[in-house]
Amino acid sequence: MTQDKILILDFGSQVTQLIARRVREAHVYCELHSFDMPLDEIKAFNPKGIILSGGPNSVYESDYQADTGIFDLGIPILGICYGMQFMAHHLGGEVQPGNQREFGYAQVKTIDSELTRGIQDDTPNTLDVWMSHGDKVSKLPTGFTVIGDTPSCPIAMMENAEKQFYGIQFHPEVTHTKQGRALLNRFVLDICGAQPGWTMPNYIEEAVAKIREQVGSDEVILGLSGGVDSSVAAALIHRAIGDQLTCVFVDHGLLRLNEGKMVMDMFARNLGVKVIHVDAEGQFMAKLAGVTDPEKKRKIIGAEFIEVFDAEEKKLTNAKWLAQGTIYPDVIESAGAKTKKAHAIKSHHNVGGLPENMKLKLLEPLRDLFKDEVRELGVALGLPREMVYRHPFPGPGLGVRILGEVKKEYADLLRQADDIFIQELRNTTDENGTSWYDLTSQAFAVFLPVKSVGVMGDGRTYDYVVALRAVITSDFMTAHWAELPYSLLGRVSNRIINEVKGINRVVYDVSGKPPATIEWE
C-alpha cells in the first residue's frame, strides 16, 4: 500500500474504533493495533503519525505500556485521555489520580497552538468537549506547554510544538465533542501531512486481493441473513472468488416478514450467487425452548448455525472457510478489539457465540469497517441502494428481540408488528419530504412476554405488549432515541393493535445509548 497511513495504538477504550472512523472520514487510511505492537512492526508500517487511544487503566500498571521508542521516530503523535497520560509519564511529566472523576460535558479554555488555531465553539478560545477520566497530568514533561485547561483539569491539553507531540484529556472521537472532527483533521491532514487518498473503490481492490490470497482455491460458506452486513460481505467475496462462494440462507424461524423470498430473489436470481436455502425453524425452536438468558440464546443460535454449516460443508469438497459479516461495532461490544483490554458489555453472535471446536476457518472481510463504510462499499459493489441502506438486523434475528423464551407464536406476532412499524416509517415524511425510515438509523419492534389488560369493543382483552425502538446515530457506538411524531406513533399503535391479534398494547422506548444498548438483548 503506497498511500499515507495513520497508526492508532489501542489501550482498550470502548470508543477507540471511533478514532479510526474519524480518520477514515478524512479519506486517510489508518489501522488500529494493540498498544504493545513491536517497534520494528511500527517502523515497517511507516505511519505519517501515531494516535494513542484512551483506556480504562493507569499508567502505573506495567501491563499497559507501549514501546517508548515511538517517541524517537520523528513523527507527530497525538495522545488521547490515557494516551496523553502515557505520553506525559514516559517523557518526564507526572500523572496523579484526580480528586474527582470528570465524566461528561466540559468546557476547555484553549491557547493558540498549531493544533487548536482557528478551532473553537460558541465563544472565542473555548471547546465544548466530552471528558471521561480519573487520573490526570499534574506536571508537564520538559519542552511541553499547556494549550487547554478546565477548572478541574489545569492541564487538559498540552503540546511540544518542536516535536509535534500533542496530548488532550478529552475524547475528540465522540460526537459529543463538537469540534472533535476538526481537531483530528488538523492533526491528521495538517500536522501529519497525510494525503486523503483512501476511498471505497481502492478498498475493494485491496480487499479482493486479500481474500484471494487468504482463501486460495478453497470453497467458502457464508450465512446469508438478508441484513446489510452479510449481504455486502457476500457481494465482496463473490467479486473476489466467484463460484467458490456458496451462501447458506438459514430460515431459523426468526427472520423478518417475507425475508426468505427477498433474499433468494436478490442473490440467487438477480446476482447469480450460489445460495442453499435451509429450512431449520424446527431445529432452532427446539434448542431455544425454555431458554430465557440472552447470552445463552445467542450462543445457542451461533452453535446451531455452525451445525447447519457443518451439514452443508459435507456436501462441498473443498469447503474450508466460514465467512461472516462481522464489523467493528460487533467486535468492540464484545471486548473483542485487538488489545482485548476493553471492558466487556455483551457477546455478539459473530464473536462470542461461536463454539471453540468450529471446524471451519473464519473469514471476516468487513471486520475493520464501520456501518456507514459497509453501506458505501455495498453501493460501490453494485448492490441496490434500498437493500444497502436497510436498517441493521442482528444475526440471531428476532431471537434477541423476543425477551425471554423464544416461541413460534411470539415470533409470528413480532414479525407482523415489526412490519407495520417499518411500513409506517417508510410512508411518513418530515417537512422536507424525507421518510422517517431514512431519518432513523435503526428501528424495530420488541416482543415483551408479559400480558396487559385491554378493552376492545365491549369485551376485555388480556394480550401481549410490544415495544417500539427507533434510534438516530452516526456510528452505532452511541445513539439517541428518535423523536418520532406523535401522529406516526399513534398510527403504528392503532394498526398493530387492530391488525395483530394477540397484541393489545404498544409502548415506545426513549432510552439512549449509553446507558442502554440499541438492542434490548
Curated annotation (Swiss-Prot):
- The broad enzyme category this protein falls into is ligase
Tell me the CDD domains matching this sequence.
GATase1_GMP_Synthase (cd01742), GMP_synthase_C (cd01997)
GO terms assigned for molecular function: ATP binding; GMP synthase activity
- As recorded in UniProt, its EC number(s) are 6.3.5.2
GO terms under cellular component: cytosol
Q: Which residues form the Glutamine amidotransferase type-1 domain?
A: 5-197
Q: Which NCBIfam families match?
A: guaA_Cterm, guaA_Nterm, PRK00074.1
**Function, in words:** Catalyzes the synthesis of GMP from XMP.
Entries under HAMAP family matching the protein: GMP_synthase
* Subunit structure comment from the entry: Homodimer.
Q: What is this protein called?
A: GMP synthase [glutamine-hydrolyzing]
Which species is the source of this protein?
A: Neisseria meningitidis serogroup A / serotype 4A (strain DSM 15465 / Z2491)
Q: What phylogenetic lineage does the species belong to?
A: Bacteria, Pseudomonadati, Pseudomonadota, Betaproteobacteria, Neisseriales
- Give the encoding gene's name: guaA
